[in-house]
Each structure stands twice: as C-alpha cells, then as structure tokens.
Design a protein with these regions (language model features):
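N-terminal glycine-rich cofactor-binding segment
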Residues: 4-21, 36-66, 82-83, 100-114
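Glycine-rich beta-strand-centered segment in the early N-terminal region that forms part
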Residues: 20-34, 47-93, 127, 132-135
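Residue-level marker of beta-strand positions
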Residues: 59, 79-80, 94, 120, ...
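NAD(P)H dinucleotide-binding glycine-rich loop of Rossmann-like/cofactor-binding domains
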Residues: 89-167
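Mid-domain Rossmann-like dinucleotide-binding core that forms the NAD(H)/NADP(H) cofactor-binding site
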Residues: 135-213, 218
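Glycine-rich cofactor phosphate-binding loops and adjacent beta1-alpha1 units
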Residues: 156, 203-280, 320
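Residues in the short beta-alpha loop(s) of Rossmann-like NAD(P)-binding domains
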Residues: 193, 261, 287
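C-terminal hydrophobic helical "lid"/dimerization subdomain
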Residues: 243-247, 289-341
Length: 341
C-alpha cells in the first residue's frame, strides 16, 4: 500500500509498504480522507518529535475493509467511519479517571501512533464511529478537531446565554464558534484577518473585531455592560492575544489557553488578581472518547458545518505541496485524499 512517511525534518516521501495485518479483535480500515493538522505540520518541520520514520495523520475517515473474527460490535465491511487515531492505553491513571486525553502512553511507539496518511490502518473497534451517507468522508475527517473544541468548551464550563470571546479565527476558532453556538452562547471573535472575520460572521458570530485596528477591550466592555466576557478561548498563538484576554475577562470569568506556545510566555496576570476576582485560567489538550462521539453527532446533525473550512484537497503525488499549503495562513484545512492517487 502507499503511505506518506515523514522520514526526517522537512522530508516526506511516498513509500510502498505492506498493509497492516489485523488481529482477531481489530478492524482493517481503508482511509478515504485525512486532515493535515498542526500536529502533522510540527512533525514535518521537526518542531515536535515522536520518532522517525512515522506515518502521520490523525484526522481521518474511511471505510471498514475487513473485520477480525473476534470483533463483537456488529460492524460490517463497507461501514463508513470517522477514525479516532490518537489512541489511549486505557490502563494508566488518567485513562482510568476519565481524562484519557492525558494518557501517559498515547505517543508510545508500541501503540501504532497516528497512521492516517496510509491507505489502510488497523484499529480497535472502539476507535471507529459509524457515519451515515448524509455526510461525506471529507466532513467526517473533521470529527477529531471538533472533538478538541468540545473538550475546550467543557474546560471553561460554558453555560447557556453566556458571553464568549474567541481569540483567533483560524480553523480551530471557527469550529469553536459553531460548537459554542450549540451551547447557547453569544460569541465574539477577534482576528486581524478580514477574511477570517467574514467567515466567522457567516458562521454565526455575534460580533467580529479587528484587534489591530479596533479597541478590543472597549468594544467588549461596551457590549457586556462593563463586565467583560464570561469566558475566553485563545486559539491564536500570538502573544498579543494572550495578553488581551486578561483585559476583557469578567470577575469569575474563565480563560482557556487552547493553543500551544513553544516559547513558553508568562501568563500576564498575578496571584492577587486571581484571588480577588475568582478568575480561572486553564488549558485543554486533545479530547476524550466521549468528546469524539459528540463531535461526530454534531457534524451529522448539521450543527457544525465544516465544509467551508476545506481549503484544498491534496493527493499522494502532491503531498509536499499539500504540506506547504497546510502551513499557510491563507488556508483553514488541507485534506489528503487517499483515493486520488
């Protein structure tokens, strides 16, 4: 089978490898689509290292090709599925306490890490989520990032009729926006890119703000009777977004640092302010199985529309260009189409 393999930093190549052999309790899935996420980009550039060579890809969809003889879930060959490819061990402290997104072994080489850039993959039945014919394989490939947004919103304990500010309107910001609207929030979106603000408006944002040209704090305070927003999610890695969040949050407000910062900036607040205001600062990383289940349903129900976020489709023959396109600020998501050659 074909697979796009990252062999070293800034080097990805198409290799012919043996398809995986499934165990009696596993499924063989033919991959249809896989998103090129920030994780794949960081593996490609060497910013993040798991091991080399590695078949990346964790935002995937496909069709069941073979079912192991001991599988008891009733799933059949031909079933269309969304795939949960960042697997958990199910045995460590975090898995056993409901925080499988913190699994100590999720990037253990023995766990068949990732793999969505291959034509086929062997998975456990718990890793597949059936999808109806009403959604495409391309849409189903967004289940994983939508699940991460659901986890993020749970971390700030977003309530009905609260005000939420999303800092950054890239693909994750747009998916956060739609998931938050499902929860009954009034959503503000801040981003200096006019095209991204326009997309957020089309997807239902109450108000979009250009933080480079407008007074973010003044606008937020105006629309919240001087309080500030109840919650803020930072999806942009820009330091100015992190700094601004603490100026627009209300007393008892919650901030989720969703994005990662490899330069590890200090949080721009102090212990006494947190003490006096009861503000909560948290982060979120990945998602759990339940988050993934909910994400699939939101896409199927049409509550989260990911189609506008598909910026380009790439193939094995164009994988290098696809990687470069995925890293451009002009794109939302680039998908690898594994059936297109």
């Amino acid at each position: 089978m074909k697979a796009a393999v990252i062999t070293s930093p800034n080097r990805i190549e198409i290799q012919e490898i043996d398809p995986p052999e499934i165990k009696a309790n596993e499924l063989l899935v033919k991959i249809k689509n896989c998103g090129i996420c920030t994780l794949e980009q960081r593996l490609y550039t060497g910013e993040m290292k798991i091991y080399y060579p590695i078949i990346p890809g964790h935002e995937a969809s496909g069709e069941v090709a073979e079912v192991g003889k001991d599988v008891i879930s009733g799933i059949k060959p031909g079933t269309r599925v969304a795939l949960d490819l960042v697997i958990r061990c199910g045995e460590c402290y975090y898995c056993r306490t409901g925080h499988s997104n913190m699994c100590l072994n999720r990037f253990n080489r023995g766990n068949r890490v990732l793999g969505g850039f291959g034509e086929y993959i062997a998975v456990k039945p718990a890793q597949v989520f059936s999808i109806p014919d009403s959604i495409s394989f391309q849409e189903a490939a967004f289940a994983e990032p939508v699940a991460c947004c659901i986890r993020s919103l749970k971390k700030i304990n977003l309530h009905l009729a609260e005000d939420l500010l999303i800092m950054g309107a890239g693909s994750m910001g747009q998916m956060h926006l739609q998931a938050a609207l499902c929860m009954g929030a009034r959503v503000f979106v801040s981003d200096p890119d006019g095209r991204r603000r326009t997309m957020a408006e089309k997807l239902g944002a109450f108000l979009t703000i250009d933080p480079a040209r407008e007074d973010l704090e003044k606008i937020i305070k105006h629309h919240t009777d001087g309080r500030g927003v109840d919650a803020c999610i930072i999806t942009s890695p820009a330091h100015v977004a992190l700094n601004s969040a603490f100026n627009v949050i209300s007393k008892t407000g919650r901030i989720n640092i969703y994005t990662s910062y490899h330069d590890k900036p200090a949080i721009p607040t102090d212990a006494n302010t947190i003490h006096r205001t009861e503000q909560v600062v948290t982060g979120s990383e990945g998602r759990t199985e339940f988050d993934f289940f909910q994400a699939v349903r939101l896409i199927v129900f049409g509550k989260v529309d990911v189609k506008p976020l598909i910026s380009a489709i790439t193939t094995y023959a164009q994988i290098e260009a696809g990687m470069q396109a995925a890293m451009s600020k002009d794109t939302y998501r680039v998908l690898l189409d594994n059936k297109a050659g």
